[in-house]
């Protein structure tokens, strides 16, 4: 945490020291991008970094300004940002985005902003944002009031991956008052977003009404809340480590890895307490969907406790979990869509692209005749070496192919006769093998 800032020299040296410490792991990066709104936080960050680069060997400093076009006052901000960058000798990238309103305009604008950042930041490059200690305290309070768990109460991480690079928040230990002191000491000008005065937004209400009241009674409230967020981040790190240990056995052993779908074995998970099961699943689902809140875990219990021949489903954002035998599988919405009809394959030496269903390659000597890819409709039979003609449904049961995958499993027909099933070499007539690269997540 920065000590009290008394004059220009001490302010500069304190902020320099903090930035050098926080950004040391990325000194070899090709570029540091500052997310430059023109507001106080990003103005101080950009100024401090450019002045620091005059005395230290740093990556090239660039700035990016995202213009949402949501309010008339904001139309002047790109020009302001350009003037500041011209004065500092910094290249500025101005990106104009269209915000699609949804349930939350704030969230839609933030999503559009970070999509623009991700597109701009190159491989191994850094995006630096100016959120400070008061922002962290505000975020913790906001999430606490929404009933967040440990991950949510960890508030904003100081580092996370973003696109091809990383996002770093180097000012989370600095208060807004300290940033204002620095800005005034250096004669900096910044813009004020008029929407920050509108108390109908929950964050503004916390910032303007709640936090000042708390700080009247407890002057170090923001510092204490930010410290709690840091402790929650540490606790979440431990929970993540525990989840990785608990998932290690559950993620092994699938007979159908060629499906390119995440799956878990149920037996290792059943050995865990309910709390550890939920922790492991939160960690596993984090990269796939929005984690369910504490009131929506009944879907998991249905999957876990169903009979082996049942096919329960747990619907989540962007897909669903399905059970097949003693495993649960994540199926994104694309997997749940229906596949098309038959596809002719005039030249089996060329990889065949299946509409919405991956691709096929034929290895070995292809059957002679008209080749066509079809999908199950029921009642299929095929000749199996040494076993005569067998019902396809029974053959797929023997191969332990999950029920949800069977409607997508490509079937190779030659002159109207089923001769091969994708990725199941035991179900292939002749000397060919049908290799299917299934669509992934």
Short names for language-model regions:
Residues 2-11, 15-40, 68, 97-99, ...:
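AMP-forming adenylation/ATP pyrophosphatase catalytic core
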Residues 211, 215, 219-222, 226-229, ...:
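Short amphipathic alpha-helical segments with heptad-repeat character
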Residues 75, 103, 200, 204, ...:
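Non-catalytic, surface-exposed connector residues within folded enzymatic/regulatory domains
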Residues 2, 6-213, 217, 241:
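Core alpha/beta nucleotide-donor-binding catalytic domains of modification enzymes
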């Amino acid at each position: 945490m920065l000590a009290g800032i008394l004059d220009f020299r001490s302010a500069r040296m304190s902020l320099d020291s903090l930035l050098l410490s926080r950004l040391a792991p990325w000194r070899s990066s090709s570029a540091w991008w500052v997310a430059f709104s023109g507001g106080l936080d990003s103005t101080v960050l950009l100024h401090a970094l450019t002045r620091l680069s005059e005395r230290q060997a740093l990556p090239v400093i660039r700035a990016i300004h995202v213009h949402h076009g949501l309010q008339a006052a904001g139309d002047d901000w790109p020009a302001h940002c350009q003037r500041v960058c011209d004065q500092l000798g910094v290249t500025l990238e101005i990106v104009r985005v269209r915000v699609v309103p949804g349930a939350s305009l704030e969230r839609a604008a933030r999503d559009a902003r970070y999509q623009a950042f991700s597109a701009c930041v190159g491989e191994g490059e850094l995006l630096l944002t100016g959120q400070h200690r008061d922002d962290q305290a505000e975020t913790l309070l906001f999430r606490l009031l929404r009933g967040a768990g440990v991950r949510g109460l960890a508030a904003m991480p100081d580092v996370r991956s973003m696109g091809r690079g990383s996002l770093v928040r180097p000012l989370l230990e600095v208060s807004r008052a300290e940033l204002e002191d620095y800005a005034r000491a250096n004669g900096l000008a910044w813009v004020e977003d008029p929407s920050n005065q509108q108390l109908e937004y929950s964050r503004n209400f916390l910032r303007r009404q709640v936090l000042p009241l708390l700080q009247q009674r407890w002057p170090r409230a923001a510092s204490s809340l930010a410290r709690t967020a840091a402790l929650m981040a540490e606790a979440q790190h431990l929970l993540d480590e525990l989840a990785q240990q608990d998932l290690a056995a559950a993620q092994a052993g699938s007979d159908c890895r060629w499906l390119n779908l995440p799956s878990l074995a149920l037996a290792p998970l059943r050995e865990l307490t309910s709390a550890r099961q939920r922790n492991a699943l939160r960690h596993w689902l984090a990269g796939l969907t929005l984690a369910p809140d504490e009131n929506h875990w009944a879907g998991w219990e249905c999957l876990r406790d169903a009979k082996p021949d049942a096919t329960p489903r747990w619907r989540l954002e962007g897909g669903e979990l399905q059970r097949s035998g003693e495993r649960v599988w994540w199926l994104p919405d694309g997997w749940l869509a229906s596949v098309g009809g038959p596809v002719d394959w005039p030249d089996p030496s060329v990889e065949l692209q299946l509409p919405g269903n991956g691709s096929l390659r034929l290895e070995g000597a292809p059957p002679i005749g008209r080749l066509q890819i079809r999908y199950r409709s029921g009642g299929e039979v095929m000749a199996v070496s040494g076993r005569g003609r067998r019902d396809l449904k029974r053959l797929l049961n023997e191969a332990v192919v999950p029920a949800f995958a069977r409607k997508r499993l490509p079937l190779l027909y030659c002159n109207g006769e089923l001769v091969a099933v994708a990725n199941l070499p035991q179900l292939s007539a002749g000397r060919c093998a049908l290799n299917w690269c299934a669509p992934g997540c």
